[in-house]
């Protein structure tokens, strides 16, 4: 089971107050429902591939409105042959849609979220939970990027969802897709906040556990890469210095170097694996800093380059 499916399964087990049940059901019917007329009767089909969500819708309708509800199961024939669950409401459809603030009294469609429906903070959370159950997805935190989104067919409702989420300081964004619109989150901290808002506390803990391990692993990898790069840089510099010292020795001899430079040159060749700090502790006459040693080695490099260029070097 995917992380998103586990999250939704957890959400379908939550207990709610009556006002919150109405807010969640409104989102589920609005986003997953479709209307049909048969024998002059209006019916509503709410379709989902998640059995737990279908049971949730069935229970909320029975509990909230005491109506006859049918539950149908069909097999998808294309691509993945998953079951499709259809919750069919065949009575009081018009009254229920109006009560859930999906249609007006004249049966015209309400495209945004009714403020009356989400007046309380708990109902705001519940509407977002219903919207996530109906059209939401969230990436497994083990994947390369963090992403949570809620899909809506029309812009007004999508904008309402974005506004509702940002009322909780989630910094959500909207984007038009080929067949609709999405409101999405990309920041891991905001995704965990959203999971907390809708009541997916087990999913939140799992997300955070995986994220912490992943971030620690990335930090260790960055540290190792940095140390490896520094080590390679140090080794490269040491090899260059030794090559230049040997070139000077083979062409004009190390006696051409001033005493302080000659001492460092001999130490560098004799102790090729030691650090600049350790070289500074080996010189006669007192300890020299890393920058002091580095300065002398650069002078040796300059002399080697002058010799390669055919210039005459005189001992100073």
From Swiss-Prot:
The keyword Nucleotide-binding is annotated on this UniProt entry: no
Single annotated GO MF: DNA binding
Keyword annotations: Cell cycle, Cell division, DNA-binding
Pfam families assigned: HTH_WhiA, LAGLIDADG_WhiA, WhiA_N
SUPFAM superfamilies per the UniProt record, alphabetical: Homing endonucleases
InterPro entries: Homing_endonucl, Sporu_reg_WhiA_N_dom, Sporulation_regulator_WhiA, Sporulation_regulator_WhiA_C, WhiA_LAGLIDADG_dom
GO annotation (BP), single: regulation of sporulation
DNA-binding region, residues: 275-309
UniProt keyword Mitochondrion, yes or no: no
Family that this chain belongs to: Belongs to the WhiA family.
Cross-referenced HAMAP family: HTH_type_WhiA
Function of the protein: Involved in cell division and chromosome segregation.
Protein name from the UniProt record: Probable cell division protein WhiA
Species of provenance: Bacillus cytotoxicus (strain DSM 22905 / CIP 110041 / 391-98 / NVH 391-98)
Gene responsible for this protein: whiA
């Amino acid at each position: 089971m995917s992380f998103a499916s586990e999250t939704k399964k957890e959400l379908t087990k939550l207990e709610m107050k009556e006002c919150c049940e109405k807010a969640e059901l409104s989102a589920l019917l609005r986003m997953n429902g479709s209307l049909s007329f048969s024998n002059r009767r209006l019916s509503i089909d709410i379709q989902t591939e998640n059995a737990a969500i279908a049971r949730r819708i069935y229970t909320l309708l029975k509990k909230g409105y005491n109506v006859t509800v049918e539950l149908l199961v069909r097999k998808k024939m294309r691509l993945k042959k998953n079951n499709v669950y259809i919750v069919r409401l065949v009575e009081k459809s018009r009254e229920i849609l109006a009560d859930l603030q999906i249609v007006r009294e004249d049966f015209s469609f309400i495209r945004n979220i009714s403020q009356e429906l989400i007046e309380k903070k708990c109902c705001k959370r519940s509407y977002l939970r219903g919207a996530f159950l109906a059209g939401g997805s969230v990436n497994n935190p083990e994947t390369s990027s963090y992403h949570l989104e809620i899909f809506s067919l029309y812009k007004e409702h999508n904008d309402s969802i974005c506004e509702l989420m940002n009322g909780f300081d989630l910094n959500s964004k909207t984007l038009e897709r080929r067949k609709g619109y999405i409101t999405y989150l990309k920041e891991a901290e905001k995704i965990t906040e959203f999971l907390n808002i809708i009541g997916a506390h087990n999913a939140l803990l799992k997300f955070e556990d995986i994220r912490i391990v992943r971030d620690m692993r990335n930090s260790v990898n960055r540290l190792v890469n940095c140390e490896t790069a520094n080590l390679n840089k140090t080794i490269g510099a040491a090899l260059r210095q030794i090559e230049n010292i040997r070139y000077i020795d083979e062409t004009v001899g190390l006696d051409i170097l001033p005493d302080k430079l000659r001492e460092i040159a001999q130490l560098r060749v004799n102790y090729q694996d030691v650090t600049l700090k350790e070289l500074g502790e080996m010189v006669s006459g007192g300890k020299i800093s890393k920058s002091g040693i580095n300065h002398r080695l650069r002078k040796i490099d300059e002399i080697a380059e002058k010799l390669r260029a055919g210039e005459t070097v005189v001992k100073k």
